């Protein structure tokens, strides 16, 4: 069900509710303007006409047999009849009713014709409610005491003789006279049946909602099932086109009873005749046809005949290619009866496609490997460029023998470093004591040339009187005083002694005093 159908159903329900509200308002307005009440001298015919008018007004206003109107009409009739009976009971003396008439009114004194003594006894007006149970309500319950009777001997009256104190229980007294509106017994019976039909229907206030609620929820037919997924991931779902609304509330989606998980599918759930094609390499194709699922007598036999296709029954790659070459795919020569012969080819195609998909999944990992290689290559290029920049500013100084007569150009931008080769960058780090003798070199004589390193190539010697890594020698400055105070704070644990030493450092004026304080502190810490 799509959203459009849901919105349409919801709008229909809202319209039905609005129509029911309007009908209820019209009924209330009609009840505000009642007719003139019945007086004490109303006849049974007038009472019946009043009830008929009320039921007709209910039908015109869109409602029938409402409990409120029926109870109101019953109370009006009962009050008028009770008032009249109370008036007659006061004006006339109390009499005991005849036993024959009393039994005849109750239907217990049979006549020669085989019927009750009360030939004009009317059945109570009954109407069925919404559940089909017969109930006597409203005016019918109050008119149960109004039973006009007419015997063969003389007219009689069915009265209820009670004390005057029991006024609420007094029933109306009617004369057994033929009313001008009732000409015959057939007309009376017809009118009573008409009243019975008028009061039999149930209320139409929410009839539109009843129609919506009564709409059955359709079950998915086999031809409307949709297959989603391949292999074992199969889900069957039906298309629901009918309304699933109930009183404006969207119901939950009903669960599907036709779902079969995995490959455990029974033959009874097959929509058509199930066929299974079996292919082998050197055999003709065989097909086992099962019976229809509706035939219950052969259901077990069809299940035993149905077999699954094993992997070794599939066509191999060579056989598949050979079968493709041998077959003629002319559409005019294709026979629908050979449909089961193509099942093996289709299975092989699906198998090949699955293998291709599995291989295509490795493309992602290959792409990730290529990206990592590119990142490593960029890092290596950056490292090589850095080393190249460092090597361009370095001169390797290799002490040793070489060509002493070679002229060397001194590059002040290069930094000398030690190496394994000899005679390279030697003139930058050494001084020649004696110039080379060209005459002796021409005669082939080996001359040892004296070489002295430059003094600037060695670091200066450590001075004993100055502070260095070898030792601390205080001076007359703020830095030396701060160093001594730091030593006192870190090494002296006695607070009183530390305070005295800091006070002595502050009072020292000469270099000798600071040295004496420093030596005493170091000596005490060593001990």
UniProtKB/Swiss-Prot annotation:
Main subcellular location: host cell
The region called Interaction with the nucleocapsid (N-RNA) is annotated at 479-527
- What segment(s) does the record annotate as region Disordered? 29-225, 285-319
Q: Compositional bias (Basic and acidic residues) at which positions? A: 49-60, 120-134
Alphabetized UniProt keyword annotations: Host cytoplasm, Phosphoprotein, Viral RNA replication
Record field: compositional bias (Polar residues): 135-161, 285-301
What's one Pfam family the UniProt record gives for this protein? Paramyxo_P_V_N
Which terms in the GO cellular component ontology are assigned?
host cell cytoplasm
> Which stretches does UniProt call biased (Acidic residues)?
310-319
Which compartments is it annotated to reside in? Host cytoplasm
Span list, region Multimerization: 312-400
Q: What is known of its domains?
A: The N-terminus consists of a long intrinsically disordered tail. The central part contains the coiled-coil multimerization domain (PMD). Forms a four-stranded coiled coil structure. The C-terminus constitutes the alpha-helical domain that binds to the nucleocapsid (N-RNA complex).
Q: What does this protein do?
A: Essential cofactor of the RNA polymerase L that plays a central role in the transcription and replication by forming the polymerase complex with RNA polymerase L and recruiting L to the genomic N-RNA template for RNA synthesis. Also plays a central role in the encapsidation of nascent RNA chains by forming the encapsidation complex with the nucleocapsid protein N (N-P complex). Acts as a chaperone for newly synthesized free N protein, so-called N0, allowing encapsidation of nascent RNA chains during replication.
Which family does the record assign?
Answer: Belongs to the morbillivirus P protein family.
Quaternary structure, per UniProt, is: Homotetramer. Interacts (via multimerization domain) with polymerase L; this interaction forms the polymerase L-P complex. Interacts (via N-terminus) with N0 (via Ncore); this interaction allows P to chaperon N0 to avoid N polymerization before encapsidation. Interacts (via C-terminus) with N-RNA template; this interaction positions the polymerase on the template for both transcription and replication.
Please report the name of this protein according to its UniProt entry. Answer: Phosphoprotein
Species: Tupaia paramyxovirus (TPMV)
């Amino acid at each position: 069900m799509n959203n459009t159908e849901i919105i349409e159903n919801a709008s229909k329900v809202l319209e039905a509710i609005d129509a029911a509200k309007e009908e209820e308002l019209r009924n209330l307005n009609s009840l505000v303007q009642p007719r003139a009440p019945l007086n004490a001298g109303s006849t049974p015919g007038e009472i019946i006409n009043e009830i008929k008018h009320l039921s007709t007004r209910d039908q015109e206003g869109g409602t029938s047999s409402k409990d409120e109107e029926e109870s109101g009409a019953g109370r009006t009739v009962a009050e008028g009849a009770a008032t009249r009976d109370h008036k007659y009971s006061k004006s006339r003396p109390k009499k005991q009713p005849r036993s024959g008439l009393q039994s005849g009114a109750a239907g217990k004194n049979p006549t020669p014709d085989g019927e009750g003594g009360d030939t004009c006894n009317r059945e109570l007006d009954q109407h069925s409610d919404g559940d089909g149970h017969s109930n006597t309500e409203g005016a019918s319950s109050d008119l149960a005491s109004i039973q006009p009777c007419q015997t063969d001997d003389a007219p009689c009256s069915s009265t209820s003789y009670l004390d005057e104190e029991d006024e609420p229980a007094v029933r109306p007294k009617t004369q057994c006279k033929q009313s001008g509106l009732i000409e015959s017994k057939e007309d009376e019976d017809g009118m009573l049946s008409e009243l019975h039909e008028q009061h039999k229907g149930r209320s139409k206030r929410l009839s539109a909602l009843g129609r919506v609620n009564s709409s059955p929820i359709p079950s998915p037919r086999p031809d409307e099932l949709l297959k989603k997924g391949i292999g074992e991931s199969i889900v069957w779902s039906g298309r629901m086109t009918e309304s699933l609304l109930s009183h404006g509330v969207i119901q939950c989606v009903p669960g599907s009873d036709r779902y079969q998980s995995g490959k455990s599918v029974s033959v009874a759930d097959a929509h058509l005749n199930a066929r299974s094609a079996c292919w082998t390499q050197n055999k003709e194709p065989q097909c086992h046809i099962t019976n229809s699922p509706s035939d219950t007598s052969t259901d077990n036999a069809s299940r035993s005949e149905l077999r699954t296709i094993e992997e070794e029954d599939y066509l191999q790659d060579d056989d598949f290619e050979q079968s493709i070459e041998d077959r003629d795919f002319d559409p005019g020569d294709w026979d629908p009866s050979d449909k089961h012969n193509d099942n093996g080819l289709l299975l092989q195609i699906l198998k090949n496609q699955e293998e291709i998909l599995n291989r295509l999944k490795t493309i992602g990992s290959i792409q990730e490997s290529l990206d990592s290689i590119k990142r490593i290559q960029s890092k290596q290029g950056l490292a090589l460029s850095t080393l190249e920049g460092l090597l361009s500013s370095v001169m390797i100084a290799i002490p040793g023998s070489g060509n002493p007569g070679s002229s060397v150009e001194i590059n002040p931008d290069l930094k000398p470093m030690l190496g394994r080769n000899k005679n390279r960058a030697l003139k930058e780090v050494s001084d020649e004591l004696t110039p080379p003798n060209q005459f002796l070199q021409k005669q082939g004589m080996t001359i040892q040339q004296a070489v002295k390193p430059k003094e600037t190539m060695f670091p200066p010697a450590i001075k004993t009187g100055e502070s260095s890594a070898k030792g601390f020698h205080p001076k007359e400055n703020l830095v030396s005083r701060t160093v001594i105070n730091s030593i006192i704070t870190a090494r002296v644990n006695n607070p009183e002694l530390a305070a005295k030493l800091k006070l002595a450092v502050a009072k020292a004026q000469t270099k000798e005093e600071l040295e004496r304080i420093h030596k005493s502190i170091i000596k005490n810490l060593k001990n």
